[in-house]
Amino acid sequence: MANDKEIAQTEFPHQKDLKETLQEKKPSQPSLSLLCSAPPPAYPSEQASVGYGTVLARTPTIFLQARGALFSALPPPRCRARYRWTWHQGRKKKKINRPTQQRRNL
């Protein structure tokens, strides 16, 4: 008889019992335990201007602005290759105009 009770308790619950109520799907109050355990949200706009972790410790202060903003020091990430190409062209021009110590001696 005791065996029958255990089997009755472990049976699959009825289909009505599995359906969630509207209150369970959309609770009216936030779960405070979930709020305490979750890390604070980091928004993409903050990450763009602040960077990740200790990255900013190695960069000069001109790079602290948001990337891609008006008058910002860095272009948006999708322009990085084009930006490097144009920067390199200017660097090559400066290099040609500046004579080295060897050229002066010749």
UniProtKB/Swiss-Prot annotation:
One GO cellular component term, please give it.
Answer: host cell nucleus
Keyword Phosphoprotein appears in the UniProt entry:
yes
Gene Ontology biological-process entries: symbiont-mediated arrest of host cell cycle during G2/M transition
Q: Where is the composition biased (Low complexity)?
A: 28-37
Q: Using the UniProt record, give the first listed, main subcellular location.
A: host cell
Location of this chain's protein in the cell = Host cytoplasm; Host nucleus
Keywords for the protein's UniProt record, in alphabetical order: Early protein, Host cytoplasm, Host G2/M cell cycle arrest by virus, Host nucleus, Host-virus interaction, Modulation of host cell cycle by virus, Phosphoprotein
Source taxon at top rank: Viruses
Basic and acidic residues composition bias: residue spans: 1-27
Q: What does this protein do?
A: Contributes to multiple aspects of the viral life cycle including viral genome amplification, suppression of suprabasal cell differentiation and egress of newly formed virions. Induces host cell cycle arrest at the G2 phase by associating with and preventing the nuclear entry of host CDK1/cyclin B1 complexes. Inhibits cellular DNA replication by preventing loading of host replication licensing proteins MCM2 and MCM7 onto chromatin. Within the cytoplasm, associates with host kinase SRPK1, a splicing factor regulator, and inhibits its activity.
| Additional free-text comment from the UniProt record | The major E4 form is first synthesized as an E1^E4 fusion protein from spliced E1^E4 transcripts, such that the first few amino acids of the E4 protein are derived from the N terminus of E1.
Q: Which family does it belong to?
A: Belongs to the papillomaviridae E4 protein family.
| Subunit relationships | Assembles into oligomeric complexes. Interacts with host CDK1. Interacts with host SRPK1; this interaction may favor expression of late viral transcripts. Interacts with host cytokeratin components KRT8 and KRT18.
Q: What is this protein called?
A: Probable protein E4
Q: Which organism is it from?
A: Bos taurus papillomavirus 2 (Bovine papillomavirus 2)
